[in-house]
Amino acid sequence: MSSDSTPATGSVKRQKTTGLAKGPGVPGVAKVDPILVVDGVERHFGGLTAVNVEHLEIPRGAITALIGPNGAGKTTLFNLLCGFDKPSSGSWAYDGKNLAGIPAFKVARMGQVRTFQLTKALSLLTVLENMKLGSPDQPGERFWASLIPAIWRKPEAEIEQKARELLKLFKLDSKEKDFAAALSGGQRKLLEMARALMSDPNLVMLDEPMAGVNPALTQSLLDHILGLKDRGMTVLFVEHDMHMVRHIADWVVVMAEGRVVAEGPPETVMEDQAVVDAYLGAHQDVDLGEVTGRIGVVSPTEAIRVREKIESAAEAELEEEEKP
């Protein structure tokens, strides 16, 4: 893998990672070093197929964007991969470990964490308390250990120190004593991202991190997402903001109607006809009458002949009207 320059974010010039795939950017292409591998994952709701992913690999150490129109199955796939939902069939592996049937909290402890489009901060806890909840394997969570302060006091202090360091990194340190309910939408997004790092993950999955964010905080969120990669983490995020995707993503996966229809570097994917079809429809430049079957599909020559016939008839009608 190699890196190419990408436009600067803030005051820091970032590098885009290239050479992630073993072949051309087609759906299901093998990656040089995948951290997440999906095989034959399907999710049905009655007669509706929400997800049908034959094969997908997420490259390690890169930022991958998962895009597609509303209802494409992106969040459903996220829920399946994180253990929040169960697939109808298929398997997937994180870092070589099969995750099928493993509950969400165990998936997170293994190093694969996620955030949500609608933030899950506990409103009646302070920002610092929310952060401390993100730390796994706390001695004080075990009943007998919680009765002996000598067991949990030192780990508790270490957890609090780590939480404060992350809050400072995300510029939320001045809010540590505030209730989470008092934060703005963008600040809650930052809190969720910071809390996810309390478990020292290898793969961070962000579900629409820019949704509902004040424009003033957009740049800060972009910087922090790029910062995850700088810290050696892999990022997989769902997003509708194509400018953001083009700006920070190393690799893009496009879903439509539950399937992966395209993948590759952002500059290539944005020009893929399958992507245009997914967002605008496969018949965006075809007469609606032809699409619905109200009129037949005609050749260009036939179309010209019909147009000339109509024009001739119109001219004849005008001449007839002009006669005294």
Residue ranges and their predicted role:
Residues 1-12:
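N-terminal acidic, proline/glycine-rich, low-complexity intrinsically disordered segments
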Residues 10-324:
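Glycine-rich phosphate-binding loops of nucleotide-dependent enzymes
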